[in-house]
Amino acid sequence: HMKHLTKKPPGENKGGPRFYNKLPKEDEPLRQKLREESRSNLLKRRSQNLLDNNELRELWMILDQNQSYPDEQLITYADYQKVCSLVSPKVKPYFTSIVFAKLQQGDSQGRVSIMSLFNYVMRKVWLQQTRIGLSLYDSSGQGYLTEIDLENYITELLPTLPQLEGLEKSFYSFYVCTAVRKFLFFLDGVRAGRVRILDILACSFLDDLLELRDEELSKELQEQNWFSAPSALRIYGQYLNLDRDHNGMLNKTELAGYGSGTLTQPFLDRVFQTLLTYSGEMDYKTYLDLVLALENRAEPQALAFLFRILDINNQGYLDAFTLNYFFRAIQDQMRAHGAEAVSFEDVKDELFDMVRPKNPERITLNDLVACGQGDTFVSILIEFHRFWAYENREAVTAEPSQD
């Protein structure tokens, strides 16, 4: 009977661990401040536990002095264990037997390159440093960066990148917008307006951004880097050139001049039906999403973006009716160029053969990504000059080089 009297009410478990603390609300500034302070102190402590440049130099000297084969810069497991006993407590977590096994390069005696070891530690330290750096901008403390968090991060990173020194201050907000869109386009698949910090660390975008610290970066590498000044200025310049009425937005007629100027009318109609517009006009942010999709057509995220536009009935697949809806405009352009229009039946068979969908009459996004030719498939349906290049690929390949 006493047992029943002393029983705790359901849900009350004072002794058990608490795994979840509610986030402070907007009208709780004191709790918010306390949470921010606690996180900031935690990140500071973590930062102090990282290896600094002097400790990394010291590690290299220890590795250098204990390599088993000085001419080859290789180390045996026995010497590796010796190094483990010599390094500081901060370094020890990096020097495990698992790491040694992971860095094996097929050496017949099971030795490992000391350079590989050192680079492994450097990379790990950099990742931890960057994770702490990004976490400082995580306003909710949930391991995500929102669009505003990312904007703050890149705005503060800007002055540390020598390759961006030449940018006009008035262009900064457009640059930040251009940089942030790439993170959101590729890493925010569910369009929640936020990106996981772990996903940022796992992709190459930060490497591309930090490449701009290199003052000697070649023109060619800059042009290939979305985050470089030439790339950002090129994209913004194209937007300004398209904006013929200079109102800062693009209407359908203006967007028709994009790229080769041969995106089809049905595709442009669907772009304006599907994407966020303001009184039928597109802003720079939406334009950037479209550019990222069209410049990276082979990537799954770009295919998902373009598939949504092609799926005119929102049915989750493309069928012969949908393909014909888009291809008619390609046939019209062929006639306008004085060429004989290709039969839709032939193209339809070719497209289905290209994708080999699980259902022989329906092409899903998964089919498109899996076939490895999604970029060609999409291009044939939405852009006349890409279709023409595909149609005449044998002739182009057979032509002698102009060099």
In which residue ranges do the predicted regions lie?
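C-terminal interaction modules of eukaryotic adaptor/scaffold proteins
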Residues: 337-403
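Primarily EF-hand calcium-binding motifs
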Residues: 51-85, 92-119, 129-144, 167-194, ...
